């Protein structure tokens, strides 16, 4: 009979998870938690695991949040810097103190490995800590005028109501690096996190709320971009918008913002090149390529999905990459020893496998990986895929896939490698593996 008894600690942990999943996590509008209808947030490593139930805001909720932020702005924009410092510092301290818990939440809702989840959470805490310090370093300038009797004083003023729209792939770091500076400099915020991963964003807002933010300064509206995001774009009371996400949506944000003459900031897609020259240290080049292309399941806008390799090292590099890929463990994000977690959801998995099929049809060779993987729990598992014999005009070389799929493009020399690297409509990030200071410096200055 003793063998049938449950470990009390395990039983308590399971009960806590069940209670958390059943709790409705509401939107925060004008300092009040509101919302009745929720949507389940599901773990991509185990689709039987419901992370939590999160309210879905309507367009009317978004309008109420904007109105609350507008009403709170005059007082918050003139608040004392020590008040802002204390709130942001308290938030940073709690995030860092809860890094294991919040990192685990991140891994459960987005699918990054636990080490990546905790690392991103620490980064979020550090961001809040940095901007807590920045509140005490606000500066201006007094400069002489060419006109007698005239003084020139330059001050930095808050913009007003800032709309924040964040993506699903960095569910705690990107909200941190948008929310923290907005609050630091006296702006009020209407925040719409990605629909797929509301948990970490809700946790940050809850921490800030308890840290003492006045009502209406920070408003959380979880829901569909087509509903909540559109209401933010349509409102003349939103003075600035910061957006990270797809290029197509970013263009719509830009057009809507121009119509309202508002400030806007966009962080969008990439098709990033990683160049490997003949003189590269092979082990360093392979490790850099694997990390950049496949870690975080390749779900980073800075992932290097175009690997451009010169002829002299090409075959050795591909063989070494293949061996490294074979050693990658694809499994539950929370399991010890997992290198690559699941893709975030079924839709993204379908996109990844569609592009693998496109690559084959275009004539590229699927050299390693690319298979769906079954594990102990139902999840969206995909073995990292490496194509060879790709060309830069193929769709797999030109379109952002946003998954663990990379293509090797063979080139003659450095000059061709640079030309291929720059032959893209994107311009986000790039890298090079070489022992030549000349080529490294030239690439740094000329990669577009």
Language-model segment annotations:
Residues 3-53, 86-90, 140-165, 265-268, ...:
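Terminal low-complexity tails and localization/encapsulation signals of metabolic enzymes
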Residues 39, 51-57, 72-78, 164, ...:
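Short, well-ordered beta-strand elements within core beta-sheets of diverse protein domains
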Residues 44-45, 59-62, 81, 99, ...:
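Residues at or immediately preceding the N-termini of alpha-helices
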Residues 48, 84, 106, 128, ...:
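Residue-level signal for inorganic ion chemistry
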Residues 49-138, 149:
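Glycine-rich loop-to-alpha-helix module at the N-terminal edge of alpha/beta enzyme cores
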Residues 66, 85-92, 103, 121, ...:
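Hydrophobic face of alpha-helices
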Residues 140-284, 411, 434:
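Rossmann-like NAD(P) dinucleotide-binding subdomain of oxidoreductase/dehydrogenase enzymes
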Residues 234, 240, 248-391, 414, ...:
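ALDH superfamily catalytic-core signature
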């Amino acid at each position: 009979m003793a063998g049938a008894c449950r470990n009390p600690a395990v039983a308590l942990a399971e009960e806590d998870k069940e209670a958390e999943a059943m709790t409705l996590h509401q939107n925060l509008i004008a300092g009040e938690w509101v919302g009745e209808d929720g949507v389940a947030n599901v773990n991509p490593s185990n689709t039987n695991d419901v992370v939590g139930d999160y309210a879905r805001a309507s367009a009317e909720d978004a309008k109420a949040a904007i109105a609350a932020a507008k009403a709170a702005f005059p007082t918050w924009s003139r608040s004392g810097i020590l008040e802002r410092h204390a709130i942001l510092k308290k938030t940073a301290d709690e995030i860092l103190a809860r890094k294991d818990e919040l990192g685990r939440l991140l891994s459960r809702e987005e699918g990054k490995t636990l080490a990546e989840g905790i690392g991103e959470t620490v980064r979020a805490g550090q961001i809040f800590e940095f901007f807590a310090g920045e509140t005490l370093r606000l500066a201006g300038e007094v400069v002489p005028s060419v006109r007698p009797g005239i003084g020139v004083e330059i001050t930095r003023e808050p913009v007003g109501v800032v709309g924040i729209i964040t993506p699903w792939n960095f569910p705690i770091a990107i909200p941190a690096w948008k929310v923290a500076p907005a609050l630091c400099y006296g702006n009020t915020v209407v925040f719409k996190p990605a629909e797929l991963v509301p948990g970490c964003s809700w946790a940050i807002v809850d921490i800030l709320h308890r840290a003492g933010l006045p009502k209406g300064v920070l408003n959380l509206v979880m829901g569909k971009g087509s509903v909540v995001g559109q209401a933010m774009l349509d409102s003349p009371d939103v003075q600035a918008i910061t957006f990270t996400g797809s290029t197509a949506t970013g263009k719509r944000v830009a057009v809507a913002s121009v119509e309202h003459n508002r400030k806007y900031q966009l962080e969008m897609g990439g098709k990033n090149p990683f160049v490997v020259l003949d003189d590269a240290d092979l082990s360093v080049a392979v490790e850099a390529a694997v990390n950049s292309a496949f870690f975080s399941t390749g779900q980073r806008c800075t992932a290097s999905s175009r690997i451009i390799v010169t002829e002299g090292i090409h075959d050795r590099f591909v063989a070494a990459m293949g061996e490294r890929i074979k050693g990658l463990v694809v499994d539950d994000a929370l399991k010890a020893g997992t290198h690559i977690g699941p893709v975030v959801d079924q839709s993204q998995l379908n996109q990844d496998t569609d592009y693998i099929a496109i690559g084959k049809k275009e004539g590229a060779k699927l050299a390693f990986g690319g298979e769906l993987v079954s594990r102990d729990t139902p999840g969206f598992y995909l073995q990292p895929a490496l194509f060879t014999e790709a060309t830069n005009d193929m769709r797999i070389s030109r379109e952002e896939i946003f998954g663990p799929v990379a293509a090797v493009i063979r080139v003659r020399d450095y000059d061709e490698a640079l030309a291929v690297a720059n032959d893209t409509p994107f311009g986000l990030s790039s890298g090079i593996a070489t022992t030549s200071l000349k080529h490294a410096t030239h690439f740094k200055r000329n990669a577009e």
